[in-house]
């Protein structure tokens, strides 16, 4: 964010959310739920969208996290420690046509059937065929017409692109856009681990950009 083409303004009370996609390894699955490995801790009781690749199409099912534990620590490409979590999730919306597609997915990729007290589970072979949508919240600290500086718990890799939104006032309409990560640094605030992240607005329609411009004009006076 070195070449600033637009004036930047500090803001208070502006919060937003983004959706991060994580590829997951499916360990086993049943009609009622799934066990996965994922690169981040999931909140027990939280509901997430799981995108399953079925041949040339994707179905999305929603699932509730029942348990989540740290499974192992792997080494990243640069030798950094990368935690891997195991989680159990219960499907919440399978009473629909998605149920038959899910049954087909299980049957297509199963390796071993495993009979448990809670019902039949199968181990499946489907590498790279499932993505988990993980919602994250953030606080906007500084904003301009071209981007913003936000604060959130998790750090993000540079050049990552993700769908984002924020509301300029409580109860107001959300401004939705695609953001690209251009800066990320860890900041310690009263022993709380947070990250300051620079985001460039990559894809925002003209009407929403006008709302943003009007807001910036109102706080610049």
Residue ranges and their predicted role:
Residues 1-221:
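Structured alpha-helical
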